[in-house]
Amino acid sequence: MKIRLVQYRDIIDCMRFDGSYHNADVNVYDSVIRKHSQHQLSHFCSEIFSTGRNKRTYTTPDFGYPYLSNSDVIAADPFMSCKYCSRKYDFDDKAVLREGMILTGRVGAIGQTSLVPSYFEKAKAMGSDNIIRIVIKPEYRKGFIYAYLSSKIGRLSFWKYATGGVQPFITETMVGLLPIPQFSQAFQKEIDNLIQKSITLRENAFNKLKETQNLILSELSVNISKRNFGKVSISDILQSHNSRFEANFHISEGADIERYL
């Protein structure tokens, strides 16, 4: 059984025993962080925002910009699994994920954070309306702040401010209330340098992954984008029952590629 002590001065502040005295790790961490914190997250940010929800027209990668969800932004190859929004009708400059932004989930993926690499912005990748963007002021170390927010204590802090029963959510204002611990400048610089190196390694890993994918396709002598996958031949239709389109004629590019391989 886990127990913890509650100081009398904490009770005097609110003049009652309330629900916040339940024995949760986040309460212990929060009390420690607040003793070593001078500012909330909003103090270090020029902007904390999420974009509005608009009508979207999905298309193929050749005619669209990447549209990333919370799960896509942390994937090794986000452009492989994401959807693509029409370049002609759906481009939203405000939704583009800029290099150095800290991302966190607004609904569902609360506490899941990531730091935007440069290739997101180069691809004009847009983030969904369920992603909260945290823009750190230039004079502060975004690598250090990201490292704290992505730590166990940081993730629990998000959930302390989250609300909602059936579908938990957190707002931009709530995110701005998170306390950020105060450390020495030397320690912050050390953490920031390590995070910057990790971002460089991630970008290099992404580039190498694309190179290996292209080598495999080249070795197989197949250009997926140029082949007529997803087509149904006339002979298949004529041989079907009553010479009609059957349910199994649905376009499955993956199945066609598998048969080709």
Identify the residue ranges that each predicted region occupies.
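Short, flexible loop/turn elements at secondary-structure junctions
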Residues: 72, 101, 107-108, 138, ...
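Short coil/turn segments at secondary-structure boundaries
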Residues: 54-63, 160-162, 227-230
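A short beta-sheet element
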Residues: 95, 99, 103-147
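Short, surface-exposed loop/turn microsegments at beta-strand edges and helix-strand junctions
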Residues: 57-65, 74-83, 94-97, 115-129
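A short glycine-rich beta-alpha junction/loop motif
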Residues: 124-132, 164-189
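Non-catalytic DNA-recognition/assembly elements of restriction-modification systems
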Residues: 1-54, 184-261
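Well-ordered mid-protein domain cores that form the structural environment of catalytic cofactors
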Residues: 73, 91, 103-113, 146-162
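Sequence-specific dsDNA recognition surfaces
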Residues: 38-56, 71-99
